[in-house]
Amino acid sequence: MAEMKARYHDARHHCFAWQLGLDGMNYRVNDDGEPSGTAGKPIYGQIRSNELSNILVLVVRYFGGTKLGVSGLINAYKAAAADVLANSKIVERTVNSVISFHFPYESLNDVMKVIKEEAPEIIHQKFDLSCSIILSIRQSR
């Protein structure tokens, strides 16, 4: 954000919303001098309606000579956030757990059959007299 504020230093407002994590509990909205609730909340509303997380949306606004009023500001920030999200590449990631397990060599075929069916990411594997595998498994589907 500091980079954007420096780049657009002559703008009147740099309003934003962000959300981290999947539970929606870690977020922040900022109106940067606009009337309370007219900038950050509409931006955050677009983040929520698109079901996004681990995201920051910053809207830079220049004063164009016409006062927009409360509803005009809300609509302008909402539309700007909607536009940027519609034209952004959304990257989907899964939440994974890393598990490690050890088993006797005699069980290798059974273990590998299950791994082949479930197709987790194999992080590390070692096959000696006893075997060990570290897997990254998606927490939910």
Give the residues covered by each predicted segment:
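Long, charge-dense
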Residues: 77-96
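Short amphipathic alpha-helix segments
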Residues: 102-120, 141
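Short glycine-/aliphatic-rich beta-strand segments at the starts of folded cytosolic domains
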Residues: 90-105, 133-135
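C-terminal regulatory domains involved in ligand/effector binding and gene-expression control
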Residues: 1-38, 124
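N-terminal positively charged helical leader segments and presequences
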Residues: 127-131
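Glycine- and acidic-rich phosphate- and metal-coordinating loops
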Residues: 53-63
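Conserved mixed alpha/beta catalytic, RNA-binding, or beta-rich assembly cores of soluble enzyme
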Residues: 36, 40-49, 60, 73-77
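Terminal, non-globular segments
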Residues: 135-137, 141
